[in-house]
Amino acid sequence: MAEPLLTEHQHQPQTSNCTGAAVVHEEHTSERPPSAEERVPKEDSRWQSRASLQSGSRPGQEGEGGLKHQLPPLQTNACPELSSLEKGEKGQNGEDLSTGGASPSAEGEPMSESLVQPGHDSEATKQEAPAAGGEEPWGQQQRQLGKKKHRRRPSKKKRHWKPYYKLTWEEKKKFDEKQSLRASRVRAEMFAKGQPVAPYNTTQFLMDDHDQEEPDLKTGLYPKRAAAKSDDTSDEDFVEEAGEEDGGSDGMGGDGSEFLQRDFSETYERYHAESLQNMSKQELIKEYLELEKCLSRKEDENNRLRLESKRLGGVDARVRELELELDRLRAENLQLLTENELHRQQERAPLSKFGD
């Protein structure tokens, strides 16, 4: 039944513009129900096809019209109004066929609808799929262009700052050298510009003075000798000596002086080690020879003092013997004086008796 309808539409002239289609569409709109005109926009072919489907499925118009409305439209170059016109004509012919009482087509309506509808949906999905596939990469590209790349990275060279008192000896040494080089560079720049330059604030001259001398580092190892109280010393002198032993003028006791001595010794040793490390090989050899000469000189002086102490030790023993003899004689003299006094008293006593 649909073949004569398709042939009629094929023989109709196809125009690229929509003028002829609009005229034919106006002729057929009078036959369409008013409900479809109210619900369907004129320029949208999708809504017109749904409206034609609703008009074909109204009560009293069941037949092949519903099936023909489900058929896909012909692929032409005409405007959407032409396709809607063709669908409207199909619906009109379907109504005529249904009014003619074609009962076999009415019985096969559900099966035909189930067969035609999936094809229409598949075509719609095929037409929409390329558009969606084209929009997706475009959207991703826009998102990538709109998104800013994170270019800030954590710095690999971080300054791990530490207070000076927490630095090790090597770190302090590097820091001091760096500061001295920087100060020398700044002073040279200021001197070149003609600005007054102050001397670099350092205590190197003090260390140089200590390096020239060789202080006795073993003074804190030996215990202090107790002051011997002689006969000619007074109690006040002894109290003053005891006060000096307990604490000095700075108010620190023996522990404080030992701490200062130990701290000075450690500082001097570190400085001496630094000076030796900075010396060249020739300078080290020269220093070693000087130390050997100094050692031999000290050994000779030590031997001389030892001999003198031995000789003085013999003299001291003789002096000690004489002192003991003097003490014995003094005690004996005192005893003789007491006895002499007693004898004098005894001699005076009988003379007084005779006088009475």
Curated annotation (Swiss-Prot):
Residues 233-248 have a biased composition (Acidic residues). Transcriptional regulator which functions as a general RNA polymerase II transcription inhibitor. Core component of the 7SK RNP complex: in cooperation with 7SK snRNA sequesters P-TEFb in a large inactive 7SK snRNP complex preventing RNA polymerase II phosphorylation and subsequent transcriptional elongation. May also regulate NF-kappa-B, ESR1, NR3C1 and CIITA-dependent transcriptional activity. Residues 307-352 are annotated as: Required for inhibition of ESR1-dependent transcription. Residues 283-311 are annotated as: Mediates interaction with CCNT1. Residues 48-58 have a biased composition (Polar residues). Residues 280-346 form a coiled coil. Residues 199-202 are annotated as: Interaction with P-TEFb. The lineage of its organism: Eukaryota, Metazoa, Chordata, Craniata, Vertebrata. Gene3D superfamilies: 6.10.250.2910. Signal peptide: none annotated. Induction: Up-regulated by HMBA (hexamethylene bisacetamide). Residues 1-162, 210-259 are annotated as: Disordered. This is Protein HEXIM1. Homooligomer and heterooligomer with HEXIM2; probably dimeric. Core component of the 7SK RNP complex, at least composed of 7SK RNA, LARP7, MEPCE, HEXIM1 (or HEXIM2) and P-TEFb (composed of CDK9 and CCNT1/cyclin-T1). Interacts with the N-CoR complex through NCOR1. Interacts with ESR1 and NR3C1. May interact with NF-kappa-B through RELA. Interacts with CCNT2; mediates formation of a tripartite complex with KPNA2. Part of the HDP-RNP complex composed of at least HEXIM1, PRKDC, XRCC5, XRCC6, paraspeckle proteins (SFPQ, NONO, PSPC1, RBM14, and MATR3) and NEAT1 non-coding RNA.
